[in-house]
Every structure is written in C-alpha cells, then in structure tokens.
Amino acid sequence: MTEFIFLLVVIGLIFVFLSVILSFIPLGLWISALAAGVKIGIFTLVGMRLRRVPPDKIVKPLIKAIKAGQDVEINKLEAHYLAGGNVDKVIDALIAAQRANISLEFERAAAIDLAGRDVLHAVQMSVNPKVIETPVVAAVAKDGIEVKVKARVTVRANIDRLVGGAGEETIIARVGEGIVTTVGSSNSHKEVLENPDSISRTVLNKGLDAGTAFEILSIDIADVDVGRNIGARLQIDQAEADKRIAQAKAEERRAMAVAREQEMKAMVQEMRAKVVEAEAEVPKAMAEALRTGKIGVMDYYNMRNVIADTMMRESFSKLGQERQQEEKE
C-alpha cells in the first residue's frame, strides 16, 4: 500500500514537471518546424519565451517563408516582432511579391510595415491596380459656365516610394487641381463637353504622381455636367454692387448739399442782421449830416419822397405779380 502511494506521488510529480516543461517549451511547435524542414533549436524557442515573444508568431511565418523558398533569418523575424511589426503580413507580402516577380527584400518590407503601411495590400495593388474615384469637381470655363467633372484614376502602388510617399488624398487633390486648371483654360464649356478626353490627357501629362506612393496609369473622365452660369451671376452681383455704391455716393452728395444749404441760410441770416445793423446807423448819419450842415432840409425831404416813391412802386409790382399768379391757377 505504501509503495502504491509512493508510485502515485512520483507519477504526479513527473506529470507536474512535464506540464511545466511543456508549457514553457513549445514541443509541438518544435516538432512541426522539424517536420517542415526548418532547423530551429529548442533553446531558441525557450529564449523566445524568456523574451516574451510568442513562438508561434515567429515559427509559423518562418515555416511559410521557408516552404515558399524565402531565405529569412529567425532573428530578423523576432526583431521585427519586437519592434511592433506584423511578421505574418510581411512574410505574406514577400511570398506574393515573389510570385508576381516583384523585387522586394525583407528589410524593405519590414520598413514599409513599421511605417504603418499595409505591405501586403501594397503588393496586391502593384499586381492589381486600384481605381480611385474622385468627388465631383466644379470648374468654370472662360465663358463663365460652370462644368462639373467626375474622374476615375487608376493607380498602382510604387513599392519604392511607400515609405515617405503621399497617399490617395494627395492624388485626389492633385487630379482635382488639374481638372480645374484645364477647364479654366478652355475658351468655352462646349470645348470641354465635346472633348472630355482632353482633360484626362492634360492632367495625366502633369506628372501628378511625383512624391506619392502610387503610379498613375490612367485618368478617365466618368461624367461631365453643365452647372450654373457663374459669369452672368458675377455680372449681376457686380451690377448690384455698383448700384449700391452709386446710391451711397448720391446720398453722400445729397447730405453735402443739405449741409451747404443750411450753411447758406445761416449766412443769409447773418447778412440780414448786418443790413439791419447798418440801417440802424442811417438815422444817426442823417442827423449828423443835418447837424453839421452837409445836407439841407429840402435835400432831406427830397430823399424821403424818393424812398416813398420807390416803396410804392415795389408794392404795385408785388400786387401785379400776385394777380398774374392767381390768373394762371
């Protein structure tokens, strides 16, 4: 009985020991690598565990690469994983590039992956070009008619410029700029409607893919529509603005005229006050002249008669003017 218990304890200890060893050493993965012809040491897998690198994240892509004929070192795969890269996607990209006869080295693919680009998608796009559809671009021809253009841009990924190259947004912006420039240089919107391919030829010859991660293969005009008459609208707005400016200037002149009128009225009142003041000095001057003997009494009365006669004639003239006015009415 004692021997049986001792045997159970020994078996239990052996089971615990093997469980710890197998959990620390991926024995099944090591056997799979050997079966696939990948030479990898058991202690290499243990080292991955110590460096907290999941061995299956490295060994499975390595098996895939070796089977595809890729010469990849396990240390490079582990270093790429520790740098935050996607090892499996890099290996898939290398295999896809090899099948498509595209020159792509592991270092280049790893750099593209670490730069945040989808290296596998880039390789696939190099084989199967992608069509980018631009939004509707509105441009105005020289005759003032708006033309709305929609284009499709066929691009292919440029592996050599994926790191540091501009993306799809830059391509769309440059194509839109080229469309606006081409339509704007057309003498009439009819030229654009008759020859829409002239837009694609002109834009394609501008080398819009410079500095981008893509190579433009073709630019096709998908749709061309006629929009608003921008020229006429601008002329209407300009005429309205000129009208408002003229009204403002007329109002300014009217205000100045009113101010000038008020100034003249004030001057008239001032002159009248001076006349009244001067008339008040006349009796004093007459008295002084009579006192000093410069005029006689008869001269004074003659002057008074002339003044009275003048006043009578003025009154007759006013009465005649009033009667004529009444007869006209």
UniProtKB/Swiss-Prot annotation:
**InterPro entries for the chain:** FloA
Residue intervals passing through the bilayer: 5-25, 27-47
UniProt topology in membrane? Multi-pass membrane protein
- Principal localisation: membrane
This entry carries the following GO cellular component terms, namely: membrane raft; plasma membrane
- Compartment(s) where it occurs, according to its Swiss-Prot or TrEMBL record: Cell membrane; Membrane raft
Q: Give a yes or no for keyword Acetylation in this entry.
A: no
Question: Keywords assigned by UniProt?
Answer: Cell membrane, Membrane, Transmembrane, Transmembrane helix
Give the UniProt family note: Belongs to the flotillin-like FloA family.
Its subunit composition reads: Homooligomerizes.
Function, as annotated: Found in functional membrane microdomains (FMM) that may be equivalent to eukaryotic membrane rafts. FMMs are highly dynamic and increase in number as cells age. Flotillins are thought to be important factors in membrane fluidity.
The molecule here is called Flotillin-like protein FloA
Species the sequence originates in: Thermoanaerobacter pseudethanolicus (strain ATCC 33223 / 39E) (Clostridium thermohydrosulfuricum)
**Name of the gene:** floA
